[in-house]
Amino acid sequence: LFRSLIGIKGTRGVGKTTFLLQYAKEKFGTDRSCLFINMNNFYFSGHSIVDFAYEFQRRGGKVLLIDQVFKHPDWSKELRLCYDRFPNLKIVFTGSSVMRLKEENLELRDIVKSYNLRGFSFREYLNLQTGMKFRSYSLEEILSNHEQIAKGILSKVRPLDHFQDYMHHGFYPFFLEKRNFSENLLKTMNMMVEVDILLIKQIELKYLSKIKKLLYFLAVDGPKAPNVSQLANDIQTSRATVMNYIKYLADARLINMVYPKGEEFPKKPSKIMMHNSNLMYSIYPVKVDEQDVLETFFANTMWKDHKVNKGDKNISFMVDEVMPFKICQEGMRIKNNPGVTYALHKAEI
């Protein structure tokens, strides 16, 4: 840790708490100069972060790991005070992806380094399941050398044997737990709406059912442009409120908003997709279209390091505004266009 204030954001369920605990174990072991605290603890209902940090560093504390920091009132002001008063104390805190860390907390804008923790990529999932250590490749490397890369991987494992399992349950780390994954994910999704969105955006509880209903309608409709007027009528609220709710769901990493090149929120997106394919199987498993799943996987994978826009006719996505991609399920007829890159399902090389 080179900075004294670091924020770890990420959607609920991707392993932020585990990340902090692993860091403490690997870097400090039983050394008590590093301490993990959770703002869910009732102790912090009657004590401030600043007072706790003062006492901790007075007793030799050097690194304070704070989980779910947004559960504490005035957390951003208190972190600023800690930063100013205890220059030798390093603080790492976790928060929800719904938090607009720098935009909505001006006192932290210039002093906090923010990172986003994502769910597992297919490569990470494959490594976990097979014990391999495949390295990551940039998009440029894959486009220029995909045959050699694929041959190297296929000499060790057959990725297609694991791909459908990843699409169904491989994005969130809790698939490793020996519990019902879908039930666990549904609970996590409910927590995203009930805690992350309502608490952080300070929305009254009576509107919870409207947000849940909106998420359900968006999921069932599949990837397409939302009919905002119809959705407003369905959940009995205004068009402006529907658009705000859609933005909150996107911030919570429950959906992705895909725009044409040059457009962004608050304009209506040209396509709304679930954030990852695991969500599709949990929220409405009886209506999961393979082409929709493949496009959701591609968009989610690209979003980490690239800009993703809706493509023109016969193009699924435009990546980084210059690379057109067409996502093709098995058996789909392809009109070979040399200017388009085709992502083919079940084509090993």
Which residues does each PLM region occupy?
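Hydrophobic anchor at the beta1->P-loop junction of P-loop NTPases
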Residues: 5-8
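Conserved lysine of the Walker
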Residues: 16-17
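Short glycine-rich substrate-engagement loop in P-loop NTPases that contacts/grips substrate
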Residues: 31-63
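Structural recognition of the conserved hydrophobic beta-strand(s) that form the central parallel beta-sheet
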Residues: 65, 90-96, 116
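Interdomain motor-coupling "hinge/lid" segment immediately C-terminal to the ATP-binding subdomain
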Residues: 96, 102-209, 215
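Accessory nucleic acid-recognition modules appended to NTPase machines
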Residues: 174-313
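Conserved catalytic cores of phosphodiester-cleaving nucleases, focusing on short active-site segments
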Residues: 298, 302, 315-333
